[in-house]
Amino acid sequence: MAAAEALGAARYFTRWYKADVKGRPCEDFCVLQHSNRICVITLAEAHPLLQPGKTITSINYQISPNCSRLQNKVSGKSKRGAQFLTELAPLCRIASSDGEEYTIYSFIRGRLIEVNENILSNPALLQEKPSTEGYIAVVLPKFEESKSVTQGLLTPEEYKEVLLKRQNSSSGS
């Protein structure tokens, strides 16, 4: 379901960004919001994992000993059984060949509809097609929160300004 929807990302989704999640420089995320409220969580283009020379070695949806996002079982129209996520809920941990580990957060309140199991067997999808087949998870905000879900997120234009400021501050030093 969501994978097929994610494929039409550029056409049917509105793109929003969250920069420096949890105060970590450049750890930026992107949410693709569909008009039906569904939000697809992806890495933003400036995320360290998407930079040249990075190789993803593992992706782990096991958040804690008692919580695995892979155990999320959703059924029915009301999405019964879906794990509820807060803005700071971790979705997965991704390790790279340089020894760095990145925690990917939901940053959207709502029900976890699905995680992308395809990236477990093919982590390169995350880097090659981050906005389509390389998405991380699909979250459905509560109906009453669906309009406010983008508060605090950046438009593509605002995100470009953030990237320009970073570039200018790094080239100025």
From Swiss-Prot:
It comes from Gallus gallus. GO terms for biological process: dendrite morphogenesis; regulation of actin filament polymerization; regulation of filopodium assembly. Belongs to the ABITRAM family. InterPro entries: Abitram (IPR039169), GCV_H/Fam206 (IPR033753), Single_hybrid_motif (IPR011053). It is found in: Nucleus speckle; Cell projection, Lamellipodium; Nucleus; Cell projection, Growth cone. Its main location: nucleus. GO terms for cellular component: dendrite; filopodium tip; growth cone; lamellipodium; nuclear speck; nucleus. Actin-binding protein that regulates actin polymerization, filopodia dynamics and increases the branching of proximal dendrites of developing neurons. This is Protein Abitram. SUPFAM superfamilies: Single hybrid motif (SSF51230). Keywords: Actin-binding, Cell projection, Nucleus. It comes from the Eukaryota. GO terms for molecular function: actin filament binding; actin monomer binding. It holds the Pfam family GCV_H.
